[in-house]
């Protein structure tokens, strides 16, 4: 999203932060167990069997936060965004309570409980750690704290975890951690978008959008944000709102899953070798050049990709280290790219938006669609009802799902690079910033055999959560869950193009009066560099 123009989106994310735990509590899923896919490797079979076994175990419905308490009643962060099974996690905790405990939950299906308790600590002595400090000139907030405890992960399955900090006073916060996969061969890869989580993390008063003055303080924003600090709000709202529901569905279906974060994809060129699919959920805006290159190479080798949101890969980042280790700093200068130390040295690494100078490389060459703007609130309109993605939904051309498009949206834009053949599955008229436009859900197939889907709306995963804001209905939730299930089933079975080729229909999608594509109109106001 464009810096300095994000009021509606920040309000939306604030609603998310306040209600993420409650939203999670109200979720339901309609997908049936069993992947329906034909396993194509030994790794695929083994991972699928393990996932079915894991989710048959008893869950714990008491994983949710019941009481946040005061902002600093208890907060913490992990010294590792991810670990391999068996590697310890170091926790840094600050609390006003005399003691606290930690419960570690693996997120999944677990017969509707949606989490399993893997470990719990004894009572740990609590104390308030020092105030946050600032690194200049990038306005990088860091919490230079002493270690509070080490969490063992022996025998922990790979997956997305929430470590819940419970102060003796009743205050609670989450610390998200990924127990990552060493290999992704034959598996559907779930990506935890740690770079984007950190970009929106306002803990300490700064994120990549604003300084302590809030929405009017763009000029004082951070130019680099550190993982060496807690997350704001409940500690995990980006995960709970934008990612958890997709994980729940995939786990319930018994698919062979692997788990990684932004940081591993950035670091490891061959991490995705042999993967069936990559799933990025909800909001995955911040990508580094190595991450994009590694995902593109995997697509070119036949890996399917599902972008289950909008605004994906809009921002170009660099990943660097902090005092606690490698890949714990997300750098993004945005419109201040002339200040980026890489400017004039290696412009391919300058952290302007992907489509902007000094080295424009629009994200649509991978995503198929292109992020257009925000805010909007519109109905989702089906354009290609006989697509395999809409199986078991009963839709017809023009079927409408109220409020599904928002707050940010993508569109197929032929002014920029577009992969062909591409099939526009929904073509939803909307207004944004006083301009008429469309949101598109689109699917393309690549010569490698890969299938790539972009849902075109940031509310997709939220709708799977039975969210009732924005006019969303149970009918919409059932629709999004079924389509997501169809995608996961098909993509788990390997390169999708042969069985599910895209039927190019881009030429039948017409502009309407005031359309920004027809008028080559930029929806964003001018920004002073």
Question: Model segments located where?
Answer:
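Structural beta-strand segments of beta-rich domains
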Residues: 87-91
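Catalytic cores of eukaryotic secretory-pathway lumenal/extracellular enzymes that build
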Residues: 50-53, 107-110, 115-149, 164-167, ...
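C-terminal region of N-terminal signal peptides and the immediate post-cleavage residues
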Residues: 23-42
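Helical hinge/lid and interdomain linker segments adjacent to catalytic or ligand-binding clefts
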Residues: 129-140, 148-151, 156-157, 235-321, ...
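Extended acidic/polar, glycine-enriched regions
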Residues: 100, 140-184
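Glycine-rich, aromatic-lined ligand/substrate-binding cores of catalytic
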Residues: 323-468, 472, 476-480
């Amino acid at each position: 999203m464009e810096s300095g123009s994000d009021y509606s989106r920040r309000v939306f994310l604030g609603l998310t932060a306040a209600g993420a735990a409650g939203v999670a509590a109200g979720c339901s899923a309609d997908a049936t167990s069993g992947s329906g896919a034909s396993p194509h490797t030994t790794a695929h079979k083994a991972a699928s069997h393990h996932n079915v076994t894991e989710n048959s175990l008893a869950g714990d419905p008491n994983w949710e936060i019941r009481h946040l308490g005061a902002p600093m009643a208890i907060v913490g962060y992990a010294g590792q965004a991810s670990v391999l099974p068996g590697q310890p996690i170091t926790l840094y905790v600050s609390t006003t309570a005399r003691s606290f405990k930690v419960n570690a939950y693996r997120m999944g299906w677990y017969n509707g409980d949606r989490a399993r308790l893997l470990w719990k600590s004894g009572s740990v002595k609590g104390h308030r750690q020092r105030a946050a400090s600032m690194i200049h000139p990038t306005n990088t907030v860091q919490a230079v704290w002493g270690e509070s405890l080490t969490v063992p992960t022996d025998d922990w399955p790979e997956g997305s975890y929430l470590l819940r900090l419970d102060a003796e006073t009743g205050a609670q916060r989450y610390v998200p951690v990924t127990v990552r996969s060493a290999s992704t061969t034959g598996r559907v890869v779930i990506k935890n978008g740690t770079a984007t989580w950190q970009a929106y993390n306002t803990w300490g008063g700064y994120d990549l959008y604003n300084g302590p003055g809030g929405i009017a303080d763009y000029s004082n924003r951070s130019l680099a944000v550190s993982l060496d600090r807690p997350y704001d709000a409940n500690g995990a709202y980006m995960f709970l709102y934008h990612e958890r529901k997709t994980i729940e569905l995939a786990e319930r279906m018994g698919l062979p899953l692997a788990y990684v974060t932004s940081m591993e994809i950035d670091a490891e060129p061959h991490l995705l070798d042999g993967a069936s699919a990559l799933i990025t959920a909800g909001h995955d805006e911040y990508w580094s050049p190595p991450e994009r290159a590694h995902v593109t190479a995997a697509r070119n080798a036949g890996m399917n990709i599902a972008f289950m949101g909008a605004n994906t890969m809009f921002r170009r980042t660099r990943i660097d280290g902090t005092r606690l280790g490698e890949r714990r700093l997300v750098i993004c200068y945005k419109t201040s790219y002339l200040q980026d130390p890489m400017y004039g040295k290696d412009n391919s690494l300058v952290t302007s938006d992907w489509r902007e100078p000094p080295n424009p490389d629009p994200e649509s060459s991978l995503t198929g669609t292109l992020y257009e703007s925000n805010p909007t609130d519109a109905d989702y309109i089906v354009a290609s009802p006989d697509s395999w993605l809409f199986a078991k939904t009963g839709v017809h051309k023009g079927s409408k799902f109220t409020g599904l498009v928002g707050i940010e949206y993508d569109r197929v834009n032929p002014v920029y690079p577009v992969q062909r053949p591409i099939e526009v599955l929904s073509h939803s008229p909307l207004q944004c910033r006083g301009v008429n436009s469309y949101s598109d859900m689109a699917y393309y197939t690549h010569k490698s055999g890969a299938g790539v889907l972009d849902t075109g709306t940031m509310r997709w995963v939220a709708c799977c959560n039975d969210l009732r804001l924005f006019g969303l209905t149970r009918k919409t939730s059932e629709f999004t869950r079924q389509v997501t299930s169809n995608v996961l089933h098909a993509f788990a079975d390997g390169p999708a193009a042969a069985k599910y080729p895209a039927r190019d229909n881009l030429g039948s999608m017409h502009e309407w009066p005031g359309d920004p594509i027809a008028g080559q109109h930029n929806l964003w106001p001018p920004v002073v560099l």
